[in-house]
Amino acid sequence: MNIHEYQAKEILRKYGVPTSTGLVVTKTEKINEAIDKLNTKVYVVKAQIHAGGRGKAGGVKVVKSKEEAKKVAHDMFGINLVTHQTGPQGQKVNHLYIESGCDILKEYYFSIVFDRSASCITFIASTEGGVDIEAVAEKMPEKIIKFAVDPATGLQDFHMRGIAYGLGFKDSQAKQMKEIVKSVYNAFIETDATQIEINPLIINSYKNLLALDAKITFDDNGLFKHPNITAMRDHDEEDPLETRAANAGLSYVKMDGNIGCMVNGAGLAMATMDIIKLYGASPANFLDVGGGADRERVKEALKIILSDKEVKGILVNIFGGIMRCDIIAEGIIAAARDIGITVPLVVRLAGTNVEKGKEILSNSNLKIIPAHDLADAANKIVEAIR
């Protein structure tokens, strides 16, 4: 789960991380009031959306008067902000965060992530802040420092020292950085986060460190322990189909292609998407119905896929282990009859009760295209939509 910048800063402040402060606005009629209340020399008006690249897209504006701030805020509120992470459709700005500006002497990058490949928590820091860390990693990898934290021992003094001195801090600033590392680590562990990113972390005119922007992502599986964090969820920032799927117990991610996929198992789902690309088309979604899906869940999965108007065909790829192929077949037929599937539908079944499943599909009198393996299925669905 993602949250907005202003919410991330609120959490970090509770753990002792110094951040820039401001006021959040959720209604246009509150804009002038917030700016008057802030009453500062420099205003920073920030669009609050769950996507990076806001600054380059015009979603962050620095102005030096109340009148300018009010105009910029009114112009920004409610627009569809398009960044390199939103896709061409953009994301509607329903929240603004208006801050007091400050002088920036130097920008840094600092984050903590759960590194799945290394099975540990990893700190990432760089003297090149305020830009995409991916660009830094590609062009100047020597500018990035990393420290892995053994989950058995947790954060140690050498981690804090290594990051502080690795970024070139000395004396009081090194002490501040070590405290920030400790605070961010504690926030990461105690909130069940998977990523906390501060970009940029700056030195201001008082020679103090300050988190100027912040992003936190949480592990959905840990949210039941944190009702206060769950309450921060902004459903307007999430794809309605993804929300609907989550409520139905389905793992669904919308993509940009036109072939809908329904698969059981994340690995098989990714392999299915790969082979669709290999045969010259693009998947419209990732959808894992899970190992224990019943007829109703299969039916709901197909309804969700067909709710995407870009879908021109559907590929169902099921390996029946825990899940029985006959149950899948019954769900497909029920969905087809209930909602009327008008796009080509290719079904590949393998595993438990596969022959029974194939028989059910064959006797349904529906226009279902059977496939005997994954390559055959991909080839048939790509040909069917051409």
UniProtKB/Swiss-Prot annotation:
If you read the UniProt record, what top EC class would you report for this enzyme, in one word?
ligase
Pathway this chain belongs to: Carbohydrate metabolism; tricarboxylic acid cycle; succinate from succinyl-CoA (ligase route): step 1/1
Q: Which GO terms describe its biological process?
A: succinyl-CoA metabolic process; tricarboxylic acid cycle
Instruction: Please give an example of a GO cellular component term from this record.
Output: succinate-CoA ligase complex
Q: Which prosthetic group or cofactor does it need? A: Mg(2+)
EC number annotated for this UniProt entry: 6.2.1.5
- Residue spans making up a coiled coil are none
Known function: Succinyl-CoA synthetase functions in the citric acid cycle (TCA), coupling the hydrolysis of succinyl-CoA to the synthesis of either ATP or GTP and thus represents the only step of substrate-level phosphorylation in the TCA. The beta subunit provides nucleotide specificity of the enzyme and binds the substrate succinate, while the binding sites for coenzyme A and phosphate are found in the alpha subunit.
Q: What is this protein called?
A: Succinate--CoA ligase [ADP-forming] subunit beta
Source organism of the structure? Rickettsia typhi (strain ATCC VR-144 / Wilmington)
What lineage does the source organism belong to?
Bacteria, Pseudomonadati, Pseudomonadota, Alphaproteobacteria, Rickettsiales
